[in-house]
Amino acid sequence: MNVPATRKDLMIVNMGPHHPSMHGVLRLIVTLDGEDVIDCEPILGYLHRGMEKIAENRTIIQYLPYVTRWDYLATMFTEAITVNGPELLGNIQVPKRAGYIRVIMLELSRIASHLLWLGPFMADIGAQTPFFYIFRERELVYDLFEAATGMRMMHNFFRIGGVASDLPHGWIDKCLDFCDYFLTGVTEYQKLITRNPIFLERVEGVGIVGTEEAINWGLSGPMLRASGVQWDLRKVDHYECYDEFDWEIQWQKEGDSLARYLVRIGEMLESIKIIQQALEGIPGGPYENLETRRFDRERDSEWNDFEYRFISKKTSPTFELPKQELYVRVEAPKGELGIFLIGDQSGFPWRWKIRPPGFINLQILPELVKRMKLADIMTILGSIDIIMGEVDR
């Protein structure tokens, strides 16, 4: 009888780009010694669409529908960063009511993003029940978005100097009811998940990132705050009207997957606090700064020109970007979402550089999974929270 010889050489495994735990078209080339991970190389670019180059050939208003395809689970933040840059370059003041509406929409979008992180993350480590629970609350958030913007996703709601429309009648009461209901939902998650011994075995002490390590790798968002760094751009940069609300930065010291989970759960509760304060104190007034139209380029329509022939045609907005450069950033659900913008006195940006949080946070993955077990790759990758639309751009 021939006994097969035991092979001791390393095994290379491809995870993705169609693996259900890759959260998009991410491919990992994993080198294994049995169940132990020796090396891991992420392969990116499967969802690259040239978003930066497209921006340089569009006006800001024309480009707004494109930006919702970066992080398509938190589209309000990509819209906010797109209009914040021109507003700062042109020194445009946003009406107070518009600022409050923006904050409400941003925090609702943060909750929706964290919910759709929580469900697949739990499914990755073997807990199927929360996956169905989170869709129950997420549908309520999308109902609010649909009532206010007309779209469940890809809202196209932000405008330079304000928002596209005011809140409809009865929307504020509906949103307050959601806040009260959602607090009970989070309590249910904590009972079901946080003290579950099987869950704790899978996440506690897995994927530890130290404080210095997190700073050196340029991590941001929950990845940074779970490592003991109290850094939140809503407190640091004082954008929109976050300074007018009472809320706390959520952070943990341990730096493992459990700490990142606790930070995101805490952030959802803080978002509810911000939304409730904004809804109760929302001021009256306009929802858009009409003075932004003074930045439109004057047209001298020639005879037989397209815009001359069609008298009833509404002229397309051509907001001129001053000849300056600017870096603007917001605290997105996954971290620091930034744009480096250079204007050259034309309707198109001369340079539009995107700093996606998922792309930066993903770089530490090979370091975290080394010397871990194969099953821990899903736990660590899920705790990072990436969306390939913004990673590949």
UniProtKB/Swiss-Prot annotation:
Subcellular location(s) of the protein: Plastid, Chloroplast thylakoid membrane
Predominant subcellular localization, coarse grouping: plastid
Keyword field: Chloroplast, Membrane, NAD, NADP, Plastid, Plastoquinone, Quinone, Thylakoid, Translocase, Transport
What does the function comment of this entry state?
Answer: NDH shuttles electrons from NAD(P)H:plastoquinone, via FMN and iron-sulfur (Fe-S) centers, to quinones in the photosynthetic chain and possibly in a chloroplast respiratory chain. The immediate electron acceptor for the enzyme in this species is believed to be plastoquinone. Couples the redox reaction to proton translocation, and thus conserves the redox energy in a proton gradient.
Q: How does it associate, per the subunit comment?
A: NDH is composed of at least 16 different subunits, 5 of which are encoded in the nucleus.
- Show the PANTHER family listed in the entry: NADH DEHYDROGENASE [UBIQUINONE] IRON-SULFUR PROTEIN 2, MITOCHONDRIAL, NADH-UBIQUINONE OXIDOREDUCTASE 49 KDA SUBUNIT
The entry's protein name is NAD(P)H-quinone oxidoreductase subunit H, chloroplastic
Native source species: Manihot esculenta
Q: Which gene encodes it?
A: ndhH
